[in-house]
Amino acid sequence: MGERKGIPMALGLLAMILFFIASSSSHLVRASDDADDAIFYESFDEDFDGRWIVSDKEDYNGVWKHAKSDGHDDYGLLVSEQARKYAIVKELAESVSLKDGTVVLQFETRLQNGLECGGAYIKYLRPQESGWKPKEFDNESPYSIMFGPDKCGATNKVHFIFKHKNPKSGEYVEHHLKYPPSVPSDKLTHVYTAILKPDNELQILIDGEEKKKANFLSSEDFEPPLIPSKTIPDPDDKKPEDWDERAKIPDPSAVKPDDWDEDAPMEILDEEAEKPEGWLDDEPEEIDDPEATKPEDWDDEEDGEWEAPKIENPKCEAAPGCGEWKRPTKRNPAYKGKWSAPYIDNPSYKGIWKPREIPNPEYFELAKPDFEPIAAIGIEIWTMQDGILFDNVLIANDDKVAESYRETTWKPKFTVEKDKLKAEEEAATGSDGISGFQKKVFDLLYKIADIPFLSEHKSKIFDLIEKAEKQPNLTIGILVAVVVVFVSIFFRLIFGGKKPAKVEKKPERTEASNNQGSGENEENKEKEKQKEEASNAARRRPRRET
């Protein structure tokens, strides 16, 4: 009987176990379904060793680590050392075509120690013509797309660069997104998304929010444009020798007036000036300091005869002046300077010469970009900061899949980090919330600085904002300076200004040099200037020559 009574309890326990397994299985199925929807996904939950290949090239001596994000149990790929070059690559099982349908590129980065000078972008590599050798991955390895944050000096942008093969010349050309969004200035986890759509549209999202929209075929969105100009200046055309570009010329009939004195000086003595009353002619402007004494360690033989330092003569303070009075000079009313003939319109003026336009031999038309496929994913960067963490690298063919990953992998971490930061700010500044207010102001200013027509002033605005972030006690003054910059730009736009001369651009014929982002380009510019050591010895006057 006892055994029979235990049967219902056992069945109940079994039911609970089955329910737990079913619940767990449902989660696993959903995760599995998400993974199945992704073309490629790397969570870095497991060690990358053996799956991602670190470059053997000598320049890339930065150490990658499998590490937890600060404050989380979530693992990522960590840049562990400062001032190093890093290169690591993951070959895909199958190449990913970018020609048909939507393709979404997404990954997370966390700049745990900030980013002063360096890159945190990813390169989506095209198939290697000479065969794939992951251990030889470097900045020369050809890529199809480069996407992600880069910051150094005046550069502060989320790159989107694609390389496209000119079907006429056979050369690859880099096309850079114009006016890209700025890199978030905090140390939180951020997710970067690039959505390539079949209608030639590109969307750049940061933390799921659209920051930039562009069209691959638009000359307004990429530099240089994907579609070259139909004509180009004829490189063989030469300016005729008799071509006169002078709009104005000296009047050949003009004659110097007879009363024009070219030798008259610009200034003459003011004969009407008089010496002020009370001028002390016999008092020097400087006297020996009566309180000065010769240092005890002064050696006359080694250091020369000691002389007291000079101070201003106190008697001269109440007087209009001391020493010899000299008559001042004034501008010579008869001065005219060198004579030159006035300018008149040039009757032979033909305008500014330009070479004639000829058909561009490299011109082509496309209905859509002919992207190279993605065969591997690589991170090749140079950075002055450590603590950069890469995580949740995703390639998908549906932006809904990317959104799902953001919600499940990025958002929980970001929420925790944001709440922690808010609590720290409130603890540091009290309950008045000043720091939180400053953060909102900074975020707004960064967004304003991203407006395209402010691009030429962007670096100046960023410098002021970053100075305010680093010196909170000066924030108000610096914010005023930023406002002054905005106001000056506003007035310049309202009232106009001198427009720069229009310069015609020649289309690029050859592949642009492998642009690795300004981080690497700025490497040689970031060397510290050496300063001479200041002397600690007391100043000593040298022996006067007699």
Curated annotation (Swiss-Prot):
Sequence segments annotated as region (P domain (Extended arm)): 232-365
Binding residues annotated for Ca(2+), in chain numbering: S43, D74, D391
Compartmental location: Endoplasmic reticulum membrane
Skewed-composition ranges (Acidic residues): 259-290, 297-306
Cytoplasmic side: 497-546
A Pfam family recorded for this sequence: Calreticulin
Region 4 X approximate repeats, annotated ranges: 234-300, 304-361
Main location: endoplasmic reticulum
Bias (Basic and acidic residues) ranges: 233-249, 501-511, 522-534
Xref: SUPFAM superfamilies: Concanavalin A-like lectins/glucanases, P-domain of calnexin/calreticulin
Glycosylation sites: N473
Stretches of the chain forming a coiled coil according to its record: none
GO cellular component, one term: endoplasmic reticulum membrane
PANTHER family: CALNEXIN HOMOLOG, CALRETICULIN AND CALNEXIN
Function recorded in the entry: Calcium-binding protein that interacts with newly synthesized monoglucosylated glycoproteins in the endoplasmic reticulum. It may act in assisting protein assembly and/or in the retention within the ER of unassembled protein subunits. It seems to play a major role in the quality control apparatus of the ER by the retention of incorrectly folded proteins.
Protein name: Calnexin homolog
Species in which this protein is naturally found: Glycine max (Soybean)
